[in-house]
Amino acid sequence: MHLSNYLIKEKKIVVATHNKGKVEEFRVLFSKYKIQILTSEDLNISDVEETGKTFEENSIIKVKSIPNNYLAIADDSGLCVKILNQEPGIFSARYAKKCGGWNEAMKKIYSRVKTKQNPDYSAKFVSCLSLKFHDGKIFTYNGEIQGKITWPPKGNNGFGYDPFFIPVDETLTYGEVEYSKKVLTDHRSVAFKKLAKVHLKNN
């Protein structure tokens, strides 16, 4: 297999998601390469059931929902809290839905950690990107950012658990930091930079 056959040369890519926060991040990441973003919604493709046991498996399930006549990318990501055995992890979005929203989910996670005998607020954000070409070949790239959860959540930037998470060596949550900076330094961007190094080097 020659990686030169898997360079992104076209100027349009489908993001396999209905999550507007993710779509906006991908828009920023791909804007440098002047690549237009389409979404599952644009193609009238419903969200798929995430039956995988890992971020990578779910990311692949999502990207496979896009027909091969489109270049496609998918992200599966989540918050992993160390003392909670890496929960909510791959269930991050579903956990929030079950709790009645992101704020309720953050409140419950913080409460679960706080009531431990020796509370440890260490956490990480994880992202796995899957890139699928027209022949069905899929490449996956992972990104992680270590940090901690904090209470109360702060800031209105970003989405999901962003106001709840402070990266290592930082004092602001992802909800407080300037959005343009966050997008270029978060877990998704770590994975994207690995992808770009391989597939976008000629752009």
Specify the residue positions occupied by each region the protein language model found.
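Anionic-ligand binding patches
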Residues: 2-14, 21-203
